[in-house]
Amino acid sequence: MMLILMRHAEAISEFGIDDHTRDLSGIGQRAALDLGRWFATQNFSPTLALVSDSNRTKQSFLGLKLSCPVKYLPSLYLATATRLDSEIRKANTECLLVIAHNPGIAELAHTLAGKDLTHPRFYAYPPGSTLVISAGKDARETSVHDFKTPEDLIS
């Protein structure tokens, strides 16, 4: 299975706003569009998306402009790497996109990619970070295709 692990794009951070309802910032909206264009140029075509039910993750998915089915899951909101892995294992699809939050999405990405990635921002996993891998039954069968942050896509 092809697996795409994406941290939501940059969100607004205003005092007093409930975390779950935070929207994307203008930068985050542009980043989601840029990532969607990158998906298209690389022929990354998710057949299913599992997305946290927070506003910023939903908006990140919508910004990608993908046509795949999507499931907005409350269980992915601030999910641990273990919870994310559990949801991924339930999915039976050819190319799965998961959009979630740090630290869980970053921890899972680091576990699956191992030491194969030398990108200077990989361990920070900033907003919009996206890892694309071929996932086998266990971590030893995983190979990295690509990793990008929104900053990598600015021309």
Feature annotation, model-predicted:
Residues M2-T82, A106, L117, Y125-G128:
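Active-site-proximal alpha-helix that buttresses catalytic centers in soluble enzyme cores
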Residues Q42-F44, K90-E94:
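Glycine-rich phosphate-binding loop signature in dinucleotide/nucleotide-binding domains
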Residues D116-S143, P150-E151:
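Domain-level recognition of soluble alpha/beta enzyme cores
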Residues T93, L97, N102-S129:
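Non-DNA-binding regulatory cores of transcription-related proteins
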Residues A81-R83, I154-S155:
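Short, solvent-exposed polar/charged micro-motifs at secondary-structure junctions
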Residues P46-P69, T111, G136-S155:
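Conserved histidine-centered catalytic loops in small-molecule metabolism enzymes
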Residues R83-A91:
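Short amphipathic alpha-helix with an adjacent loop that forms part of the alpha/beta core around
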